[in-house]
Structures are given as C-alpha cells and as structure tokens.
C-alpha cells in the first residue's frame, strides 16, 4: 500500500507474482481499521473455518506494503479434501448467491485440474 496525496493506493506488482493472499491483503489494506478483523470475517462467511487470517505490514526492496498471514491448524496424517468436503463447506457458508456461484465455478475448475493429474 502506497500513500500518494494522503490516500491509500493499491499497487499490484504482477511481475513479482500474484496469489489470493496478495489480492486479499491489498483489498483488506484499503479498508484497514482496528474495528475490522479478517479472521472474524472469514469465520462469519465460513463458520466451520478454524484458520486465523491476519493483515501484516511488509517491506520488499524498500517498498512498504501489506501481506496476509493465514494460519491453519495442521490435521494429523496426510489429509485430502474431496469435492464433497468443499461443497459441504460452501453449503455451510454465508456467501451471497453471486459469490457462491463464482466460488463453485472456481472449485469445479480446480477439481477438473486435480483429476487430470491424478
């Protein structure tokens, strides 16, 4: 997050790579507030979620920014989530109909990709 003319600016450095945590951090950084908790938001949307999501200040090559730290409890053994497990988590979520439709489409693409390599 850069400050330009006293307001936050979201800068995405595509050449450095882009992932969901980076996008989440950028958007959450725009709304940064002591009254806003990413963990609480995640648990509100996905009640079964036991992960902690934290916005953390970061510096890369002298440029200040933010990143997301996502801490998930490690299950015992080698665990896989099936499409049915993910669908159940989505069913338990409080996502809007539009967000749910997008999430389902993303998971279907990922499931097909996983199936093609196994």
Residue ranges and their predicted role:
Residues 30-118:
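Glycine-rich nucleotide/cofactor/substrate-binding loop typically near the N-terminus or early
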Residues 1-11, 109-118:
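Short, hydrophobic/aliphatic alpha-helical segments
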Residues 2-52:
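N-terminal phosphate-binding or glycine-rich loops at protein starts, especially the Walker A/P-loop
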């Amino acid at each position: 997050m850069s400050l330009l003319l006293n307001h936050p600016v979201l800068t995405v450095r595509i050449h450095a790579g882009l992932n969901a945590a980076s996008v989440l951090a950028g958007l959450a950084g725009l709304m940064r507030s002591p009254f806003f908790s990413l963990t609480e938001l995640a648990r509100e949307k996905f009640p079964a979620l036991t992960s902690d999501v934290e916005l953390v200040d970061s510096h890369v090559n002298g440029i200040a920014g933010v990143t997301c730290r996502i801490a998930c409890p490690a299950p015992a053994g080698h665990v896989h989530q099936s499409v049915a497990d993910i669908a159940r988590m989505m069913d338990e979520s409080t996502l809007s109909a539009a967000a749910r439709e997008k999430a389902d489409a993303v998971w279907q693409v990922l499931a097909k990709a996983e199936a093609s390599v196994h």
